[in-house]
């Protein structure tokens, strides 16, 4: 673990339904998929979707671009 980072107890847990309070996805709601207490961030289903470029591998020789959820700060969400 990096120095200077402290685990914080968050107000949301996995599988909670939350609403986004600020940012580009403001007003959207979804289920919490994952919680990162050390970074104070959460991943919410269907919120903060970004494109990720995947390298070519033996199973996928062409590579691909997939869309997935990225974490947002826990202070930007509230339970619904």
UniProtKB/Swiss-Prot annotation:
Q: Which InterPro entries match?
A: KOW, Rib_uL2_dom2, Ribosomal_uL24, Ribosomal_uL24_CS, Ribosomal_uL24_KOW, Translation_prot_SH3-like_sf
Which domain of life, per UniProt?
Answer: Bacteria
The UniProt entry, under Pfam families, shows: KOW, ribosomal_L24
Key word Cell membrane present = no
The record's region (Disordered) falls at: 53-80
Mind listing the GO biological process terms from this record? translation
Kindly list the GO CC terms recorded for this protein: ribonucleoprotein complex; ribosome
Q: Which SMART domains does the entry mention?
A: KOW
Q: Which GO terms describe its molecular function?
A: rRNA binding; structural constituent of ribosome
Q: Which NCBIfam families match?
A: rplX_bact
PANTHER family referenced in this protein's UniProt entry, alphabetically:
MITOCHONDRIAL RIBOSOMAL PROTEIN L24
**Entry similarity comment:** Belongs to the universal ribosomal protein uL24 family.
Q: How does it assemble?
A: Part of the 50S ribosomal subunit.
Name of the protein in its database record: Large ribosomal subunit protein uL24
From which organism does this entry originate?
Chlorobium luteolum (strain DSM 273 / BCRC 81028 / 2530)
């Amino acid at each position: 673990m990096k120095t200077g980072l402290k685990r914080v107890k968050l107000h949301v847990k996995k599988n909670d339904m939350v609403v986004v309070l600020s940012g580009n996805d403001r007003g959207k709601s979804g289920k919490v998929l994952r919680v990162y207490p050390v970074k104070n961030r959460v991943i919410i289903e269907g919120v903060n979707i970004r494109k990720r470029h995947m390298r070519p591998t033996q199973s996928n020789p062409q590579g691909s671009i997939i869309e997935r959820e990225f974490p947002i700060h826990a202070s930007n969400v509230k339970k619904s």
